[in-house]
Amino acid sequence: MFTDYGLNGPYVGQLHAVVAYVAPDAPAIDLMHDAPARDPFRSAYLLAALAAEMRPDSICLAVVDPGVGGDRPPIIVSVDGKRFVGPGNGLFEILQRRSSRAKAWSIDWRPEKLSSSFHGRDLFAPVAAMLARDEWPTCSPLGEGWREDPGRPGANWPDDLAEAIYIDGFGNVMTGLRAAGLSERAKIEVAGKLFSRARTFGDVAKSQGFWYENSLGLVEIAVNGGSAARQYGIEAGAPVALRN
């Protein structure tokens, strides 16, 4: 499960309750529930990075849905054997763009009771659980042209996002830039500060800031023994620049 619901309150528990009822034998894993709130744009880059570590037959219930109850379609996206269920608001744009084998379906199935404000519980969770039982709800294929439609949500988003997209509990600042291919000498500028590359925390002095390739393959700003976000005043959405 990947959502922006947060762990406080009743929302995540209700997702688990639905999945456990519909597919009691399917393990449900909380991937993260503090995705960028009401922000499918930045969440799309985070989800794409996390998806690379999922096993090929995974089913991911992913909900960052500020337009819940509106006209955005509910969809299933299959990417390299992994299936994602959630809103068609661009949340799956980056992961499908990075794959040569992506298909999508619009979900036609509807439950008897559908809250206008909680499609995660009433629509997406049951569909994800059905897929976990090898059952397909009523769907309509979006066809081969859906990936080329310039009007689809997220069509104009960049392949890599030069912004801070997530700040973890340690104050490390994850960006939407992939580290693969960047020079060892490349510097990252954010909040008016230039950061050099290091392999890991112990390679720099205490309280020193640096950037490194994190476990998801993204550029991350960190401080050895401290919080990069607090020390340098970096917030989610801060622009990031690559300097050679």
What are the roles of these predicted feature ranges?
Residues 1, 60-62, 165, 221:
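Residue-level marker for buried hydrophobic side chains located in beta-strands
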Residues 22-28, 39-45, 54-57, 61-64, ...:
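Active-site histidine-anchored catalytic micro-motif
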